């Protein structure tokens, strides 16, 4: 993999160069404005291109080191693109209302996420029949409300290492929280926005649907590049590895997952998965997980259970994705 490539023509076709009406501008964006046409500011794409590349590199580097990226875009035209890009790259997103304290009061947000999980369990299990129709509707409404705000971060497991923002004016609270915690911010900054405090500023139109889709696609591909780099830098000799046999009797675990009683041959070095420490590897081993293929075969529910067991539910999807890649290449 490599950083996603893009051209100035793509930016032009997506309308990235169109700013706001000249009387609505923020003077702090003057250096990124090429000029005005029909009272509309035109963004200097000669600056957008290298600044976008810089942001993509930073995002790829963050993920390659095991970091998490949070996509933030709550305006109507950004909601679908933000959610799709985050899901495609196994990251996290907020595309509805930003709840104040999402970053700075993570403990309280975690409590709300636990409530969301509880409601999911109740409504998706046989226990729901114990409630009246009215009670089930009340629980469903509460669940839907929480899911709109927290569904994209319920598996994050902790604070993100970088946030990517569409429309810095609308998401100013999210940016302020990130700045307060020292979390880097990559953002699309239009001509009516204040660039102050944005770590990786990308001048561009933050309203056009095609432009937003292009930004999100590039960021998602940069994340995937980071995941690929993390695998490549692990030093695993894939050509010398082979898929181990699985005929030994497994040991039952509290999670419902059946692990192995011991490694089949030489165990894989799970620490080479991005973000897995020695302590996490030991927890995997205690659960009977010694090989990449075991992680690769986890379904979504079991993966979440395993993530809860090792204390990092928000990271397990990335590990499963990496393990699938390694297993497929080994075959």
Swiss-Prot record:
Q: Which NCBIfam families match?
A: PRK12311.1, rpsB_bact
According to its UniProt entry, one GO biological process term is:
translation
GO MF annotation, one? structural constituent of ribosome
| Source species taxonomy | Bacteria, Pseudomonadati, Pseudomonadota, Alphaproteobacteria, Hyphomicrobiales
The name under which this protein is listed is Small ribosomal subunit protein uS2
**Classification via PANTHER family:** 30S RIBOSOMAL PROTEIN S2 PROKARYOTIC AND ORGANELLAR, SMALL RIBOSOMAL SUBUNIT PROTEIN US2M
Q: Which organism is it from?
A: Rhodopseudomonas palustris (strain HaA2)
What CDD domains would the database entry show?
RPS2
Keyword Ribonucleoprotein, does the record have it? yes
Gene Ontology, cellular component aspect? cytosolic small ribosomal subunit
Alphabetical list of InterPro entries matching this protein: Ribosomal_uS2 (IPR001865), Ribosomal_uS2_bac/mit/plastid (IPR005706), Ribosomal_uS2_CS (IPR018130), Ribosomal_uS2_flav_dom_sf (IPR023591)
Pfam families attached here? Answer: Ribosomal_S2
Q: Which UniProt keywords apply?
A: Ribonucleoprotein, Ribosomal protein
Q: Which family does it belong to?
A: Belongs to the universal ribosomal protein uS2 family.
């Amino acid at each position: 993999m490599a950083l996603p490539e893009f051209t100035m023509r793509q930016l032009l076709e997506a309308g990235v160069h169109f700013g706001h009406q000249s009387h609505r501008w923020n003077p702090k964006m003057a250096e990124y404005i090429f000029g005005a046409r029909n009272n509309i500011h035109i963004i200097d794409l000669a600056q957008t291109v290298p600044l976008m590349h810089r942001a993509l590199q930073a995002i790829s580097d963050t993920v390659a080191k095991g970091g998490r990226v949070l996509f933030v875009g709550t305006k109507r035209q950004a909601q679908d693109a933000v959610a799709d890009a985050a899901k495609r790259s196994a990251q996290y997103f907020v595309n509805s209302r930003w709840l104040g304290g999402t970053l700075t009061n993570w403990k309280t947000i975690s409590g709300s996420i636990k409530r969301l999980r509880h409601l999911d369990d109740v409504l998706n299990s046989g226990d729901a029949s114990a409630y009246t129709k009215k009670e089930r509707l009340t629980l469903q409404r509460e669940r839907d409300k929480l899911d709109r705000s927290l569904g994209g971060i319920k598996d994050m497991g902790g604070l993100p290492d970088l946030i990517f923002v569409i429309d810095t004016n609308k998401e100013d609270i999210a940016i302020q929280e990130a700045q307060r915690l020292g979390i880097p911010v990559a953002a699309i900054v239009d001509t009516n926005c204040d660039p102050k405090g944005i770590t990786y500023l990308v001048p561009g139109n933050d309203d056009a649907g095609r432009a937003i889709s292009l930004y999100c696609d590039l960021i998602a591909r940069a994340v995937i590049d980071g995941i690929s780099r993390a695998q490549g830098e692990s030093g695993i000799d894939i050509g010398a590895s082979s898929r181990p046999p699985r005929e030994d009797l497994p040991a039952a675990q509290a999670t419902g997952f059946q692990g192995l009683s011991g490694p089949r041959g030489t165990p894989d070095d799970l620490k080479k998965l991005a973000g897995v420490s020695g302590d996490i590897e030991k927890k995997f081993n205690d659960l009977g997980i010694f090989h990449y293929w075991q992680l690769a075969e986890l379904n979504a529910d079991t993966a979440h259970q395993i993530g809860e067991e090792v204390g990092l539910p928000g990271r397990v999807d990335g590990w499963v994705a990496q393990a699938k890649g390694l297993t497929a290449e080994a075959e």
